[in-house]
Amino acid sequence: AYAMRVDTFPDDGEFAGSDPDLMFRQLIMEAGADIAILEPLAFGARLPEAAQASAIATNLWIDEHWLSSTTNWHQRWRGSISVAIEDPEGAAREIEKWAGHPYMAQILIKAEPRPSWGDPRYDPIWQAATKHDITVSCHLARGSFETLPIPPVGFPSYNHDFMVSYSLLAANQVMSLIFDGVFDRYPTLRIVLVEH
């Protein structure tokens, strides 16, 4: 919500970007996009169980509110399978549940939880992604304070300082994927880093 366009707030006062008809007009018709991949960021729970419950609810909401035949009549919305990376087994179950959905285009994770992605504990996620040939996307998220990236000069004072630090987090996660052998174990795994 820090960088939302003011014109994305619907007339009914709901959250920015929450109205499929308004977003269709702005993102598809006016911007000229062929499709739009939705990346809902509904995380922030400190407990893995709560993060998993949030991911499950988000997927149900995306399916009902954005991908139904009523709101996706034009077939140009694509959803993201939100998963709680903190609960790899639960995340894999959620991937299995939604992998066959015709409009779920990718798996959505966040970068902040520790340990880094190369840790074998995350293998159920990578295994499910490669089994179903679905790209894993990581979008910037705002985790709890102790999970945020810390720049070499200390904690950020301003939002723009904080945003720049995400490139460090992304670089560390990519190094972990490579050096900890994830791409050796799952050579067809595809990962996209958004806004890093």
Locations of the language-model features?
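Helix-coil boundary/capping segments in enzymes
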Residues: 1-196
